Regions:
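Short acidic loop-to-helix transition motifs that present clustered carboxylates
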Residues: 89-90, 111, 184-186, 214
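Conserved beta-strand segments of the P-loop GTPase G domain that flank and frequently precede/overlap
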Residues: 106-107, 150, 180-182, 208-210
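Sensor-1/coupling segment of RecA-like P-loop NTPase cores
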Residues: 170-190
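P-loop NTPase motor domains
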Residues: 1-175, 257-278, 286-288, 292-312
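P-loop NTPase motor core of the ASCE superfamily
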Residues: 101, 165-168, 187-312
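N-terminal start-of-chain detector that recognizes signal peptides
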Residues: 75-79, 149-151, 177-182, 239-243, ...
């Protein structure tokens, strides 16, 4: 509630995240309350809510503000704070971005995920919320141009809380989501068992790579792939000579051990109402756009500074 009030006050007053960070560091600062009381567009009751939080029992207040400080930990990095405090003319306009049909790249690293992931997550959630609101004003309730979210390492880089619902109903609003996870266990750890199951069920196309190690998940995928008919040939010998027979049996189309040991570059594709497909994937360096990608990598990969010292 405190951070919500701070962000609302900043938006009303044209303040920056630097100001918000200052309010977080100084709980007694009267500026946000003054803004919430004076601004005509302020949400009713929010000023009083912030006053009540500030006047709470010291132990309770300290606990609340400790949580607020953790929420803005990423802003302690001057580079992150600078990126989140642009001049008014350079601020990111989600509505204009959606209308323009551009591409937004959000990059993160494993080392920075604990601090920066909340910011990336908030940006993605804001983008999705803006897309839903914009879609509601369009014919058929679908966004045009549509929005595609390619969420690689979704559980680490941008673990958006609404992802299970987004996979379930985002397509109806023109929002297509591609979610890449290391395993179903990773999804359960981030969104809980119910959330992970909802995501798995909502995904219209599931692409499974090799290397999974969770036996229950492998069995689940194997059962989804279904069974195939196999013939068992038997031969016996009796007084009348040899005799043969053929009896049918059902075998898993994709046994657990086959799923686990899929070679690199191979995948099992499970799409709704269609049999499983064993696909051989084409890496980008073997695809038709390889030269363009290499050229882009060369132009945008930072080169070592000339004259830099090299440690022996």
């Amino acid at each position: 509630a405190v951070l919500r009030c701070y962000l609302h006050a900043a938006a009303l007053d044209g303040a920056s995240m630097r100001d918000v960070l200052g309010w977080v560091a100084r709980p007694a600062d009267p500026a946000p309350v003054r803004i919430l009381r004076a601004a005509s567009g302020a949400a009713p009751g929010w000023a009083e809510e912030l006053v009540a939080q500030s006047a709470a029992d010291p132990r309770t207040r300290d606990s609340v503000w400790a949580g607020v400080r953790r929420a803005v930990d990423a802003l302690a990095d001057p580079r992150v704070l600078e990126a989140c405090s642009p001049p008014a003319e350079q601020q990111f306009d989600t509505a204009a971005f959606l209308r323009g049909g551009g591409t937004l790249y959000l990059l993160g690293t494993t080392g920075a995920q604990l601090t920066v992931a909340p910011l990336i997550t908030a940006l993605v959630e804001d983008l999705v919320d803006a897309a839903r609101r914009q879609a509601a004003t369009m014919t058929g309730g679908r966004l045009d141009p549509p929005l595609t979210l390619l969420l690689d390492e979704a559980a680490n880089i941008a673990p958006i809380p609404s992802l299970p619902n987004l996979l379930a109903d985002g397509g109806g609003s023109g929002v297509t989501t591609v979610c890449v996870l290391q395993s179903l266990a990773q999804a359960r750890a981030r969104w809980g068992p119910a959330g992970a199951d909802a995501m798995w069920d909502a995904a219209t196309t599931k692409v499974v790579l090799g290397g999974l190690a969770h036996a229950d998940d492998l069995s689940r995928i194997s059962r989804l792939a279904g069974d195939i008919d196999d013939a068992v040939h038997t031969r016996s010998y009796g007084p009348s000579g040899p005799a043969g027979s053929v009896s049918p049996r059902r075998l898993p189309a994709m046994p657990v051990e086959r799923l686990r040991t899929l070679p690199v570059g191979h995948a099992i594709v499970l799409a709704r109402r269609t049999p499983p497909v064993h696909a051989v994937l084409t890496p980008w360096w073997a695809g038709p756009h390889a030269d363009r990608i290499r050229d882009t990598l060369d132009r945008h990969t930072a080169a070592p500074e000339s004259g830099a010292e090299t440690a022996a």
